[in-house]
Amino acid sequence: MAAPRWSASGPWIRGNGQGCGSLFTLVSKPFCAAAAASTAINAQRLAEKLRAQKREQDTKKEPVSTNAVQRRVQEIVRFTRQLQRVHPNVLAKALTRGILHQDKNLVVINKPYGLPVHGGPGVQLCITDVLPILAKMLHGHKAEPLHLCHRLDKETTGVMVLAWDKDMAHQVQELFRTRQVVKKYWAITVHVPMPSAGVVDIPIVEKEAQGQQQHHKMTLSPSYRMDDGKMVKVRRSRNAQVAVTQYQVLSSTLSSALVELQPITGIKHQLRVHLSFGLDCPILGDHKYSDWNRLAPQKLSVGTLKKLGLEQSKARYIPLHLHARQLILPALGSGKEELNLVCKLPRFFVHSLHRLRLEMPNEDQNENNEAKCLGAQ
């Protein structure tokens, strides 16, 4: 027979389903009679207590995080999901608050984290969907839709250029295609690139990764490989594309770095592949390219997790720390000067810099001060 358990109202006993007779072996008849006469303990109250106990047990199994960093990570996850569910007008209004530059030719916005540029499977809302609404908010109800000039990955934040008409969009797209636009990205890396500055010039190709889950990734397609200590030329894949990235370490510790990246070419996932597979320094929060064979949360060292204030089980929620920091466009139309566009870092990026003890260059002292304020919260 089950042992008695105690509730807020006294002892209750898990019987064997045989009726009141099973209780008489544990309690005296007077006590049993009194309990039967009492209306304080009834089936409804008992059921409520059982439900309350179950909720309490579930809470103990999955405690709510009180860690400030983990709360911020959870907020980013919730925010990213909300972006896919808000009304297009709400999203367009949010984008107007992040406008970096606006003139008769262009509108430059600060692209938020987790927002896709184009539609696709599973995408409920993207930037392309709200371009007509955004144009009307800026130029009135008769305004024609804005046009995309280039793209950024869903997880990448920062400078994004839109044009008021198709001709201007094509002009800017041609500048990107002919590599006349200077693009600078900032990334936080796991490990420190060696040497601290250089150029990665390794072609990239898309391949199928063989693992528990079959999936496709971009990867390196080098022209040479080492064979018994000798450098041997490799036959180039016909699908490989030339990919060149210039990089410089801006700040570093023993286990992480703030790196400025200047892609000379514009191949899909170029920066992520060159950092992870070329320099063995994956971007913090890159859960796709931190391991070739697996699609799994990024594995971080105990020291890095401790600095970030996270457990490994929460690493899956770390956002990709890749930010389109700056674009320099040549003079457009009747303009005589180049257009230098700089975008402030997102708050989660700034906070991670502070937690990892990474310093920003002196000219970015205001954002550095913001990092310290966030860390003190």
Curated annotation (Swiss-Prot):
InterPro entries: PsdUridine_synth_cat_dom_sf (IPR020103), PsdUridine_synth_RluA-like_CS (IPR006224), PsdUridine_synth_RsuA/RluA (IPR006145), RluA_PseudoU_synthase (IPR050188). Its EC number is 5.4.99.-. It catalyses: uridine in 5S rRNA = pseudouridine in 5S rRNA; a uridine in tRNA = a pseudouridine in tRNA; a uridine in mRNA = a pseudouridine in mRNA. Keywords: Coiled coil, Cytoplasm, Isomerase, Mitochondrion, mRNA processing, mRNA splicing, Nucleus, rRNA processing, Transit peptide, tRNA processing. Disulfide bonds: none annotated. The active site is at D153. One of its GO terms (biological process) is mRNA processing. The keyword Cytoplasm applies. Residues 1-15 form a transit peptide. Residues 36-62 form a coiled coil. Gene3D superfamilies: Pseudouridine synthase. GO terms for molecular function: mitochondrial ribosomal large subunit rRNA binding; pseudouridine synthase activity; RNA binding; tRNA binding; tRNA pseudouridine synthase activity. GO terms for cellular component: mitochondrial matrix; mitochondrion; nucleoplasm; ribonucleoprotein granule. This is Pseudouridylate synthase RPUSD4, mitochondrial. It comes from Homo sapiens.
